[in-house]
Each structure stands twice: as structure tokens, then as C-alpha cells.
């Protein structure tokens, strides 16, 4: 458990690093903190925070930066909505949107463009069809050759989706096990309720097959992507402008993540948040995966009548979480106001 002083130091380092993208040393912390403590005390407390995994130190002579654990603590325990900032942003957004001019879909897309510009993050808007009454009815396996299999997903509305599997990538026996597990758990479940079963399904797959992550993602994406209406992306250019993505491989991974974003990612990142009754889901660094340790994802689902739209922001781990959180809450409020 962190002390009040350690929390203040962690908050100072997180917020200063977000602003400057430079490691924060004890001298700068002392300048920013409104506390009567010595540089030696700050160094000792910072060393403790580093030892406990909240901070990282790139070089022996440099200051410290937040780790994924440090950002997570900040998001969960420190950041709060500032009512003055919230009101200012609300007036600004409403002026830009001029709500009378747009229907809900256009409002969401335009608001996403504005939020992307304000946060310098890439915004992905996925509008989902009304799938309230559609159920998964059956999953069938067809062996096409020694190295190729087809999995058919059959829905209550008569739609059939086909996914091909190279048996060099995933064993036939694993596919059969996965189909049985999916059939046992998800057949006759409404598609908009699938997220309630994912955690249990993921655990069962983990215990039963080798390529459990790949199979789970592929199956869920095939089930859900067929029911998408549209996907729009705003602000891809900000990927190029963020210094975190100067490394070509990191940039490629970030772009790939955005291009492949699907309804499953919403279910995946929202699970913990929904458990805690949060409207906004935040995934940071290696909480997404090990490859994308420098990335953050913030998402919310906007319910409009019987349909819904998922808005996801993707950017570096070093983002202004407080600002993003306020903007996401604002768009939820604006859409709810417009719908009513």
C-alpha cells in the first residue's frame, strides 16, 4: 500500500512525464511538489516506487518514468474528473458540434474526429448492427485437405460465416476441442450477450489447447465481424507524430493494431471495467499484449436505441489519461442528451 507521500510523488512523475516526455528527476519533483521534504527523501521514495514496479529508470544518471503498473495505479486511484475542466471542454465540444446539424451517427463521427485532434490519438469508430435477437445456432468443421479446414458459423437469421484454417498453424484436434467448447458455451446465446461468457471460455481454452489465444480471437472475430455495419478511423497521422513510434517496428505494430481492431477487442478490454461498473475501459501497455507495451487503448460503447457504436482511442502509453477520460465521459453525455 502506497503512502500519501509516495502517491504524490507518483502523481507528479506521471503528470510531468506526460507533458514533457522526459524522465523526471528529484530536483524537478521538489520544484513541483508543495511539500516540505528534502531531495534525499524524494530520491529514497522514488527508489522504493521503482523497486515496487511503479517507476522505471532508463539510465543511472537520469530521472524516472512511469511503468505500466504506475500508469495503472494513476488511472485507478489518482486521476479525477475536474469539474471546471469538464465544463470548459463541454462548452467547447458543444460549440464545435452544433448538435442541431447532425444525426447521432454523424455526431459520433465528428466528435471522434475532434477528440482525436485534441488528444493526438487515433480514433476508431465501429458501428454494430442491431444483433439483439440474433443467436449463434451451430458450428461445423469441414476438413478440406490434409492441411486445410473450414469452420462454419451458422446464425439464427440464416447467415453463415466461413473461416479457413491452415492446419500447420493450428492442430485439427485443437480445432475440434475449440468447436465443442464454443458450441457448449455459446450456441443459442444472443450475440450481444457473448461478452458475459468470454472469461470462462478463455479459461477453458487455455486449459485445453495450445493456440488458445489465436483460436479464441479468430472464432470471436468471425462471429462478430460479420455483423458490423461500418468502421471509420480518424487521426492515423498522429501515430507518425508521437515520438514513441519513431521506431519503425513499433509504428508497424501500432498501425496493425488499429487496422485489426474489432468488436472482440471491445469485449476484451472492457471485461474488467464492466465488472467494476465503469463506462470507460482503459488498457495500458502490456495489458494489451507484450508486443504493444508502448500503447494504450481507451474505449467506450455508446448505446443508441437497439444499436451500439464502439469508440476506441489508440495512442502511446504516455497520454493524458485525465483529459481522455473527461472527453470520453463528455461524448457519452452528449450522445445520451441528443438521443433523449
From Swiss-Prot:
The entry's keywords: Repressor, Stress response, Transcription, Transcription regulation
Gene Ontology annotations of biological process type: negative regulation of DNA-templated transcription
> Entry's Pfam families?
HrcA
Q: Mention one GO molecular function.
A: DNA binding
Quote the InterPro entries the UniProt record gives.
GAF-like_dom_sf, HrcA, HrcA_C, WH-like_DNA-bd_sf, WH_DNA-bd_sf, WHTH_transcript_rep_HrcA_IDD
What PANTHER family does its record include?
HEAT-INDUCIBLE TRANSCRIPTION REPRESSOR HRCA
Q: Which NCBIfam families match?
A: hrcA
The similarity annotation says: Belongs to the HrcA family.
Q: What does this protein do?
A: Negative regulator of class I heat shock genes (grpE-dnaK-dnaJ and groELS operons). Prevents heat-shock induction of these operons.
- Specify the protein name: Heat-inducible transcription repressor HrcA
Amino acid at each position: 500500500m502506497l503512502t500519501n507521500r509516495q502517491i504524490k510523488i507518483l502523481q507528479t512523475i506521471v503528470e510531468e512525464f506526460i507533458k514533457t516526455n522526459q524522465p523526471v528527476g528529484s530536483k524537478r519533483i521538489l520544484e513541483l511538489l508543495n511539500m516540505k521534504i528534502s531531495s534525499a527523501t524524494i530520491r529514497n521514495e522514488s527508489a522504493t516506487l521503482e523497486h515496487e514496479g511503479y517507476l522505471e529508470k532508463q539510465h543511472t544518471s537520469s530521472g524516472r518514468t512511469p511503468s505500466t503498473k504506475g500508469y495503472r495505479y494513476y488511472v485507478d486511484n489518482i486521476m479525477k474528473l475536474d469539474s471546471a475542466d469538464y465544463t470548459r471542454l463541454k462548452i467547447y465540444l458543444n460549440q464545435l458540434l452544433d448538435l442541431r446539424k447532425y444525426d447521432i451517427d454523424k455526431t459520433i463521427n465528428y466528435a471522434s474526429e475532434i477528440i482525436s485532434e485534441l488528444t493526438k490519438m487515433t480514433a476508431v469508430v465501429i458501428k454494430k448492427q442491431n444483433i439483439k435477437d440474433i443467436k449463434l445456432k451451430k458450428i461445423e468443421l469441414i476438413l478440406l485437405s490434409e492441411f486445410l479446414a473450414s469452420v462454419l458459423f451458422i446464425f439464427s437469421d440464416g447467415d453463415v460465416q466461413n473461416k479457413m484454417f491452415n492446419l500447420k498453424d493450428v492442430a485439427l484436434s485443437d480445432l475440434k476441442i475449440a468447436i465443442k467448447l464454443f458450441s457448449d458455451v455459446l450456441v443459442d446465446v444472443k450475440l450481444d450477450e457473448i461478452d458475459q461468457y468470454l472469461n470462462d471460455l478463455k479459461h477453458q481454452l487455455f486449459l485445453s489447447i495450445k493456440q488458445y489465444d489465436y483460436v479464441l480471437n479468430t472464432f470471436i472475430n468471425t462471429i462478430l465481424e460479420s455483423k458490423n455495419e461500418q468502421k471509420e478511423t480518424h487521426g492515423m497521422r498522429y501515430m507518425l507524430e508521437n515520438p514513441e513510434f519513431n521506431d519503425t517496428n513499433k509504428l508497424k505494430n501500432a498501425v496493425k493494431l488499429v487496422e485489426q481492431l474489432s468488436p472482440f477487442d471491445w469485449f476484451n478490454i472492457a471485461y474488467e471495467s464492466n465488472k467494476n461498473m465503469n463506462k470507460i475501459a482503459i488498457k495500458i501497455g502490456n495489458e494489451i499484449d507484450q508486443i504493444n507495451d508502448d500503447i494504450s487503448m481507451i474505449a467506450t460503447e455508446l448505446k443508441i436505441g437497439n444499436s451500439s457504436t464502439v469508440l476506441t482511442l489508440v495512442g502511446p502509453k504516455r497520454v493524458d489519461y485525465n483529459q481522455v477520460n473527461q472527453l470520453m465521459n463528455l461524448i457519452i453525455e452528449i450522445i445520451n442528451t441528443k438521443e433523449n
